[in-house]
């Protein structure tokens, strides 16, 4: 190997070392959580208001005669999902409206948070059933029993993120929800 090839090889090795060191240092400085916008921390809806088990939500829907809101989200990585939660779902206006009008179901596809395998399987099946291509997506459904003992989730509408806060979001979904 001649001197120019040795010099070139050393440069490549040195550049790879510097690049690896720089990337490693940058990765250590990335915050592990996304900060909430100012003014959103004061109102947190009851976490138990959001079901994760669809069968429990169906039972509640039968009992209350309310439709189910299926919220497909990537809670720990999807920027638009986090915005929707902060700007709409974590507000007093939405919490009050939801308690009166729908059964809330969170169908989460996290990257960092662990979930029971049964929830992962349920969420994957529902994602395929509703052909969800992106997050956040909210499907509104009414469960209806079929003659063969199964349950049909009749779609009544869908929505995702939209600007305008809780009032605009609620006005949009109220257009297709059953009237009381």
Describe every region a protein language model picked out.
Residues 2-14:
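Bacterial N-terminal signal peptides that target proteins for export
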Residues 50-68, 98:
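A short beta-strand-turn-helix
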Residues 87, 128-180:
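Non-catalytic, surface beta->alpha helical segment in thiol-disulfide oxidoreductase systems
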Residues 25-27, 35:
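Boundary at the C-terminal end of the N-terminal hydrophobic targeting segment
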Residues 12-24:
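Bacterial N-terminal signal peptides
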Residues 64-78:
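Short active-site neighborhood of thiol/selenol oxidoreductases, capturing the structured segment around
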Residues 48-51, 94-121:
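Thiol-based oxidoreductase modules, predominantly thioredoxin-like and allied folds used
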Residues 81-97:
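Typically the conserved alpha-helix immediately C-terminal to a functionally engaged Cys/Sec
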């Amino acid at each position: 190997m001649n001197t120019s090839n040795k010099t070139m090889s050393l440069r490549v090795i040195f550049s790879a070392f510097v690049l690896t060191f720089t990337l490693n240092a940058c990765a250590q400085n990335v915050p592990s959580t996304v900060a909430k916008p100012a003014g959103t921390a004061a109102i947190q809806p009851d976490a138990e208001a959001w079901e994760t088990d669809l069968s429990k939500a169906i039972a509640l829907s039968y009992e209350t005669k309310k439709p189910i809101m299926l919220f497909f989200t990537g809670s720990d990585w999807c920027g638009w999902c986090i915005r929707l939660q902060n700007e709409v779902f974590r507000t007093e206006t939405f919490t009050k409206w939801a308690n009166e009008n729908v059964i809330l179901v969170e169908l989460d596809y996290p990257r960092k948070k662990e979930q029971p395998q049964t929830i992962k399987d349920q969420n994957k099946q529902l994602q395929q059933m509703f052909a969800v291509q992106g997050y956040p997506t909210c499907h509104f459904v009414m469960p209806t029993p079929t003659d063969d003992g199964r349950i049909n989730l009749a779609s009544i509408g869908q929505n995702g993120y939209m600007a305008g806060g809780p009032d605009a979001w609620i006005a949009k979904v109220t257009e297709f929800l059953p009237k009381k």
